[in-house]
């Protein structure tokens, strides 16, 4: 899931037809990541748009 990738990953890659469509760097943060933070919400929306799916 996108949320799991945001919580656990440091880099998220969107692949379409075997090609890299988009890459995202998730900064290493001290403490826990907050998916309700504006930065994470914006990143999730961008990933969803690149996947051509609706929220």
Describe the function of each predicted region:
Residues 5-7:
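A short, surface-exposed alpha-helical micro-motif characterized by mixed small hydrophobic
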Residues 14-48:
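Conserved beta-strand-loop-alpha-helix hinge in the C-terminal portion
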Residues 49, 53-55:
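Short secondary-structure subsegments characteristic of cysteine-rich extracellular domains
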């Amino acid at each position: 899931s996108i949320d799991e990738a945001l919580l656990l990953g440091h880099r998220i890659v969107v692949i379409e037809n075997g090609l890299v469509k988009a890459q995202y760097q998730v900064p290493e943060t001290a403490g826990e990541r907050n998916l309700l933070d504006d930065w994470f919400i914006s990143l999730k929306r961008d990933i969803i748009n690149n996947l051509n799916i609706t929220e």
